[in-house]
C-alpha cells in the first residue's frame, strides 16, 4: 500500500516538474520571439 502511494506521488511530482519546465521553455521562446520581432521592426524602419 505504501509503495503504491509513493509511486503515485512521484508521478504527480513528475507531471508538475514537466509543466514547470514547459512553462519556462514557452516563456523563453516568447521572449526570444518578441526580441526578434522588435529587431525586425527596427530594421524595416531603418530601411525606409
Curated annotation (Swiss-Prot):
Compartment annotation: Plastid, Cyanelle
Name of the molecule in the record: Uncharacterized 5.7 kDa protein in psbM-psbX intergenic region
Organism: Cyanophora paradoxa
Keywords: Cyanelle, Plastid
A GO cellular-component term linked to this record: cyanelle
Superkingdom of the source species: Eukaryota
Primary location recorded for the protein, binned into one broad class: plastid
